[in-house]
């Protein structure tokens, strides 16, 4: 799932010359649903959008407050073209979820937003319609979000934390320099005449993950 989040002073959606929804200060979210998206990706994206800190706090400090913190509005628009793959110069959308399935999924996304936040502050366009989306970007500030691919290690928070700790340990090991065991291996040893001959090799004490 992909989303383009824009901080706005106002935004609106028009269909057939008629304005169907509008917001004031807040964020406009263009959402692209992929074939492989599940409830897990949906919940991940809802959390990211609602907690993304793109607003300043009362003291003027930037990137300190989320749309929920500020109690601002959200305008959501389904945008299957975010799942575009170029074939030469021609856009291809085979990675986007089919329309019939995507509509229900998109409605579930809106429902989850409204359940987590204030429902009266969540607005949306018209799924499947030809729309004119008017966005007054504030800044401009535009953030791209993407949920972890289903089935990858990074989609599991516990696994992600484990991988991060492993990487930190590796970095600490490199910073300390050669380990004692490595120093011992590199120290010349007296030849043992009674030992059988054979090929010698260096085996690293650090395993690749």
Curated annotation (Swiss-Prot):
The modification Phosphoserine is found at residues 197, 204-205. Homodimer. Interacts with CDC45 and TOPBP1. It is found in: Nucleus; Cytoplasm. GO terms for cellular component: cytoplasm; mitochondrion; nucleus. It comes from Homo sapiens. Its main location: nucleus. Belongs to the DTD family. Transmembrane segments: none annotated. Residues 159-170, 181-194 have a biased composition (Basic and acidic residues). Keywords: Cytoplasm, DNA replication, DNA-binding, Hydrolase, Magnesium, Metal-binding, Nucleus, Phosphoprotein, RNA-binding, tRNA-binding. This is D-aminoacyl-tRNA deacylase 1. Disulfide bonds: none annotated.
